[in-house]
Amino acid sequence: MNKAPAQMSRFNIAPDMDSSSTNSNEYTNYQDHASKVPLNGIQYSDVEAESQNFLSDHHLGKKKYEAEYSPGSASFGMSVFNLGNAIMGSGILGLSYAMANTGIAMFVILLVAVAIFSLYSVHLLLKTANEGGSLVYEQLGYKAFGIPGKLAASCSITMQNFGAMASYLYIVKYELPIVIRAFLDSNDNAWYTNGDYLVLIVTMSIILPLSLLKNLGYLGYTSGFSLLCMVFFLIVVIYKKFQIPCPLPENFINITVNVSQPPQTNNSTDEECCKPKYFIFNSQTVYAVPILTFAFVCHPAILPMYEELKDRSRRKMQNVANVSFLGMFIMYLLAALFGYLTFNEAVEPELLHTYSKVYNFDVVLLIVRLAVLTAVTLTVPVVLFPIRTSVNHLLGASKEFSWPRHICITVALLVCVNILVIFVPTIRDIFGFIGASAAAMLIFILPSAFYIKLVKKESMKSVQKIGATLFLIMGFLVMTGSMALIIMDWIHNALSSEEHTGGH
């Protein structure tokens, strides 16, 4: 797999050109930069994709950035595949839940809107990189707004990474107990089938040792494996739609054959439950947009992939993004649609876990679970790398590597994410909170703010600047509106829970 420099300290990108065919001739000295990984571990040298850390200690005061011409090496097809890896993440598991709480028609409208807005955001980001003279996300923040801009970019990327890491561990918490019960052929509630204990065991025995390594290069291969896992998962979701009857009969367990003739029922309520709905509004509808934004975030990976692209130009990179987003759009739509049509109102925030309502043991689903568990477990250490680098930098640590500091930061981060996974009630809350905050910042707010500030040749009255300004305003509305509604839902649930407890 092609690799490209993730950090550049000198650029000479012509503002008025449609191409940016320059590379850096010197690099920063960080030892710990990792590659972006959504539900994958693809590496663009030292870049992370759903997560990412482009903290730099460049001399930013210079007017001009000089660089030698150094063409990228990634083909169009490879770039499309890499960006697909960057987009695809655990968010796909929450899309059926979003559809179940918006209806098919409303979900499709929202999915199309978020995909188009994400592509527009990529356009703004590429143009800003050309005009601003940097292919480093956080450096664009510094050039636009100084230290606050750099911190905003850094914190947003770190939050997105932390949310991604938590969502992966949540998948371990949900799915590993089911796998263990299947292998032991047992339904008891022993400690070794408790998700909280299993998350701690997996963290200490696998994730912590891998996270303490100074180099995770070999884990870059998990990216392709992760994407294949999700394709396999999608195929299984479509296949199972035609195997699982609706409504689900009580005690519908261990069905492996003869499901082509679902049980007859005269219950009109059950029939109503099995009828797909096109528009739904309820208390959970507020999570739909944050789940979608969480699923489409890949923007910190765009710039290093742009630098890596062979014969690069803005138009070519935009076409790469168009093809990748179209592919992920189709996968997301199919996964959401068939997951929703299978379970309708009964779908859970994490789709794969919903199948445990139907099958106590199923070989195909067991293979899917094992594959997904392997992928997410190997991805967590890669996602943790840039977070640790960011913390290192913010603490003002010296560039000299220190094992005690390295170990302390790693352990502290893993302790925090484990506490979050153990005490947060559902993965829906992680999708919702991170999608409404960090993802909204990375898709809507930061690219438009950087564009407005750094692209000088267009006046504020130009169509482009007006469009970017409206996009910025919409980003703030999405973030504040979603966060307010989600917090209100949390408060309502907490009060309802207290009343229910008090009633007994």
Swiss-Prot record:
The keyword Ion transport applies. It is a multi-pass membrane protein. It catalyses: L-alanine(in) + Na(+)(in) = L-alanine(out) + Na(+)(out); glycine(in) + Na(+)(in) = glycine(out) + Na(+)(out); L-serine(in) + Na(+)(in) = L-serine(out) + Na(+)(out); L-proline(in) + Na(+)(in) = L-proline(out) + Na(+)(out). The keyword Nucleotide-binding does not apply. GO terms for cellular component: plasma membrane. Na(+) binds at N85, T379. Pfam families: Aa_trans. It comes from the Eukaryota. Residues 1-28 are annotated as: Disordered. Residues 1-99 are annotated as: Regulates protein turnover upon amino acid deprivation. Its main location: membrane. Belongs to the amino acid/polyamine transporter 2 family. It comes from Danio rerio (Zebrafish). Residues 100-105, 181-189, 240-285, 344-364, 428-429, 489-504 are extracellular. Inhibited by N-methyl-D-glucamine. Inhibited by choline. Allosteric regulation of sodium ions binding by pH. Glycans are attached at N254, N258. This is Sodium-coupled neutral amino acid symporter 2. One of its GO terms (molecular function) is amino acid transmembrane transporter activity.
